[in-house]
């Protein structure tokens, strides 16, 4: 039995015939995997684009609900306020803790450790980790990593800012989020190293109170997405577009920028002094 590009059973078609709108939420600040666009009031990023294709291929309709943070989004999933979370680590134990069902993964990533190129003076590593992330649990549970001193932040970017400012020595992130942030000029002093022994896959997380047919239908929609389509989505979302500004130029070219600012300041000062001198002569 065919519907769109997917093969559905009669039972699944019966569900689709009367399927309710699926409520979805996301981490609002985890680009490029997921985010929330305030202008359009909808989700953005790799996960949202993948879900758009799932909608095309299955006929399912999704409505996004804003969350303030990943912790808030996860809380909404746990309490069954929403039907789906756009990115949940593909870990069945983690899913069970959060009363969730996992789709097949749509994205696989390696994990990197991010450090400041300027060494810090701490006696031992202070590690910045994001709240409520499965990755945080994986790092803490692994004896290979030094996590005696941990500081928690709400977002991955806040962890990067902590490392940049020297409040922390390192942080951990998936390679997509890390590369997206490291492409920004302000993080030019940070560098990443891939952890060969650790990877993480992202799935859609469904409330465990959802109809089991919904999970099957979404998985079939994901199976219809080609590797070329997924590659295109990833490439479109992973290129950070930095708006040109004076601050950006100062970050990118600090020495030249300081020289230009000093030259402009001296010129303006000379003009001001000249105007004052002319004015004082006229008043005599």
Protein language model features and the residues they cover:
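Sec-exported extracytoplasmic/periplasmic mature domains
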Residues: 55-60, 78, 82, 144, ...
